[in-house]
């Protein structure tokens, strides 16, 4: 497992962003684990998370000019990544959107850097149904930006539905024609659990969940 994947999963565990047990998802599925990026709620945690995101995207070679964070959780994540990149000597513009357009002041739906004619990297927590990411893609294109890729914290690698055996991330990547990168995946989580004595007992429920809902490439 790549170092940034292991660091991210350990960080998520420390922050209580990654929990094990029984959780009912929005889809109605009963999951043995749950990820909540909202638990990265301090400067230190966000700084370390920004480093994990930066390492993950650096490993891909994707070229981009602007970092974009979809409202709401994507905003602090994109900001943390942009700050980390600046620490590494790469100063990049940052942009994000409001959920509702503002009618006064500077107005509009977008805040931050101009994206017109620029290659834009979307930074978010997860892709569940893909609705928020598709909305972000539309916002970027409407602003004249060119979507270059998407990076998320965790890819659950599970099928979107009984009729679509792609994951939500795979579906978005195919529809948009851009790569979707994950800092870590369900496969990484299984490896991580196997190597952690405190988590090894959760491996069997994780394996069973993957066997039932995992995309075919990892079953």
UniProtKB/Swiss-Prot annotation:
Cofactor(s) listed: Mg(2+)
A single GO cellular-component term on record: cytoplasm
EC number: 2.4.2.10
Self-association and partners: Homodimer.
Pathway field: Pyrimidine metabolism; UMP biosynthesis via de novo pathway; UMP from orotate: step 1/2
Binding site for orotate: 34-35, 128, 156
Reaction equation(s) it catalyzes: orotidine 5'-phosphate + diphosphate = orotate + 5-phospho-alpha-D-ribose 1-diphosphate
Transmembrane segments: none
GO biological process, one term: 'de novo' pyrimidine nucleobase biosynthetic process
Pfam families: Pribosyltran
Highest taxon, organism lineage: Bacteria
Record organism: Stenotrophomonas maltophilia (strain R551-3)
Role played: Catalyzes the transfer of a ribosyl phosphate group from 5-phosphoribose 1-diphosphate to orotate, leading to the formation of orotidine monophosphate (OMP).
Protein name: Orotate phosphoribosyltransferase
PANTHER family associated with the record: OROTATE PHOSPHORIBOSYLTRANSFERASE 1-RELATED
UniProt similarity note: Belongs to the purine/pyrimidine phosphoribosyltransferase family. PyrE subfamily.
Enzyme class: transferase
